[in-house]
């Protein structure tokens, strides 16, 4: 039964990822005053299926000098971790209601760094290695602020379980009392998922394609799926943390619809940002984090820690 539940979670995620690629190409197309994919199927609806068939029927080539075990393991690890992070997400009922669901998600996103590092190192190519080092430095840096912002929101909800956040936000979304945190969280998720304007890892002009430059066919498709699954997952987490939908226990499907709509809107904003903004320079990327976000998030975290202590001495107002 658990395996069936697991499948009913994984299959929709993979389907969503497949059609997100189509939505992205369509939106970017219309923003650049062109059509986007419109040949395969009605309005290009079968394009993701054609892409999948093309990628998985290609011969998975590998460089002669690569470390074969790591080279094959890296994309598998990337996709496995991307799908594992969906387990504690409440929609409104999670697959596993973990006491420390937030910590689990942080740990899984930290492990994703290994997939990037392995793929760059095992390819035995200087472009892949430089791309991987960039990706790892960026991911590790932005995880610092993500962790602090998560801690601040948890101080407001009072539990490490994600399901508690639904109850916390019955009366007010957490985006309202903590909008600076939300802004920084959203920008950090862009950087964490290597999306424009922070897509330094795949700087085509200097690194060809980044850490996955030597991958082709199936393994490349796995990296691609992992990247887009992470994007949807990060937006789903943003919805859970800051835009919590109201959950009526008798009609859980209303929560799911609400949750999906908000996640979709956030994902659209990712694509909108990609079409609108140019890429950051690498030093600007690091300055933004270490000199702007980190001091601000630390100050706000201290504020959320001290606030209940300061208020504790005030007698109840009737």
UniProtKB/Swiss-Prot annotation:
Root EC class: translocase
Enzyme Commission (EC) number: 7.1.1.2
Q: Please give the Gene Ontology molecular function terms for this protein.
A: NADH dehydrogenase (ubiquinone) activity
Q: Which GO terms describe its biological process?
A: aerobic respiration
One annotated Gene Ontology cellular component of this protein:
mitochondrial inner membrane
Q: How does it sit in the membrane?
A: Multi-pass membrane protein
Catalyzed reaction equations? a ubiquinone + NADH + 5 H(+)(in) = a ubiquinol + NAD(+) + 4 H(+)(out)
Where in the cell?
A: Mitochondrion inner membrane
Q: Does the keyword Transport apply?
A: yes
Report any Pfam family annotated for this entry.
NADHdh
Q: Which InterPro entries match?
A: NADH_UbQ_OxRdtase_su1/FPO, NADH_UbQ_OxRdtase_su1_CS
Q: What are the TM regions of this chain, as residue ranges?
A: 2-22, 68-88, 100-120, 147-167, 171-191, 217-237, 254-273, 294-314
Keywords attached to this entry: Electron transport, Membrane, Mitochondrion, Mitochondrion inner membrane, NAD, Respiratory chain, Translocase, Transmembrane, Transmembrane helix, Transport, Ubiquinone
Stated role: Core subunit of the mitochondrial membrane respiratory chain NADH dehydrogenase (Complex I) that is believed to belong to the minimal assembly required for catalysis. Complex I functions in the transfer of electrons from NADH to the respiratory chain. The immediate electron acceptor for the enzyme is believed to be ubiquinone.
Instruction: Provide the family line.
Output: Belongs to the complex I subunit 1 family.
Q: Which PANTHER family match?
A: NADH DEHYDROGENASE SUBUNIT 1, NADH-UBIQUINONE OXIDOREDUCTASE CHAIN 1
Name of the protein: NADH-ubiquinone oxidoreductase chain 1
Gene name linked to the record? MT-ND1
